[in-house]
Design a protein with these regions (language model features):
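Eukaryotic N-terminal targeting leaders
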Residues: 1-3, 241-244
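Short hydrophobic segments within beta-strands
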Residues: 8-10, 38, 128-131
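Active-site rim beta-loop-alpha module in soluble metabolic enzymes
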Residues: 130-202
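N-terminal glycine-rich phosphate/adenylate-binding segment common to multiple enzyme folds
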Residues: 56-99, 109-112, 195-208
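N-terminal beta1-alpha1 ligand-phosphate binding loop
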Residues: 3-28
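N-terminal beta-loop-helix "entrance" segment that forms/cooperates
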Residues: 37-63, 168-174
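Short, hydrophobic alpha-helical segments
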Residues: 122, 188, 230-242
Length: 244
């Protein structure tokens, strides 16, 4: 049976949504998933670069997804919702709370929680590469306070966050690829001794294979958070359906 998923880009950049769609269509079978895409309204920021814009985007998106039952984006019309922003985005928690109050079985995941849980299960050294420097303390605090297992902490597998010092929309530019690769080599691999590098921003979407090829000799695993988030979401949906 086909699962019905909504991918939410909580910022107002339509180009980012198009990039997400292009990446997803290359990796997820249309035979198994029907995927719709939502871009934040004009009241959402064009890019999310910290806590303030995260909250702003949540306040802009939540009413569109939960208030109008006739909307094509009404959350209960979907089996699952992926919030495509790499952060502890408040929209994830808010949607889960609304779903719980309305006793809905819709599954909701974000990119940060799903990718960190994947790394917890794999059990290898991992770190994050992100966009601007403002994200370093935010992501480190979120990961350390909410998402690490006891085993990951005991084995010191979590190595921290590295910034490219680039804005979100600049990450996808081919002109910046070498700069990103150099930072990963110097910081994530050599300095932090990471075996897994989480591509910690939706702006990295589609770069997983290119980076894997660049670092083939090192054997580094690059985690495309969109792909991991979707696969985990699909598994959650199938499990919920199996209980019916």
């Amino acid at each position: 049976m086909v699962v019905n998923i909504l991918v939410v880009n909580p910022n107002s950049s339509k180009s980012m949504t198009i990039s997400l769609q292009e990446t997803i269509e290359k990796t997820i079978s249309k035979e198994s998933c029907e995927i719709s895409y939502f871009t934040g309204p004009n009241t959402s920021p064009p890019q999310i670069d910290g806590q303030e814009t995260s909250v702003q985007s949540m306040k802009a998106c939540l009413p569109v997804l939960t208030d109008d039952k006739g909307s094509i984006y009404y959350f209960q019309k979907f089996d699952g919702i992926l919030i495509a922003c790499f952060s502890d985005h408040p929209l994830v928690t808010e949607l889960k709370d609304v779903a719980a109050k309305e006793k809905s079985n819709v599954s909701v995941v974000g990119l940060l929680d799903s990718s960190i849980q994947y790394c917890n299960l794999v059990g290898r050294n991992f770190s994050i590469i992100t966009s601007n420097k403002e994200w370093i303390p935010i992501l480190n605090a979120s990961v350390q306070s909410k998402f690490l297992t006891g085993n990951t902490i005991d084995k010191n597998l979590w190595k921290g966050t590295v910034s490219t010092d680039l804005q979100v929309l600049a990450l996808h530019s081919p002109d910046n690829f070498q700069q990103i690769a150099d930072i990963i080599r110097d910081e994530n691999l050599r300095k932090l001794d990471s075996e897994i590098v989480i591509l910690g921003c939706a702006g990295f979407s589609g770069l997983q294979n290119k980076l894997a090829k660049k670092f083939e000799k090192e054997g580094t695993l690059f985690l495309d958070t969109i792909e991991v988030g979707l696969e985990i979401l699909i598994t959650m949906i199938k499990f919920v359906r199996s209980q019916k």
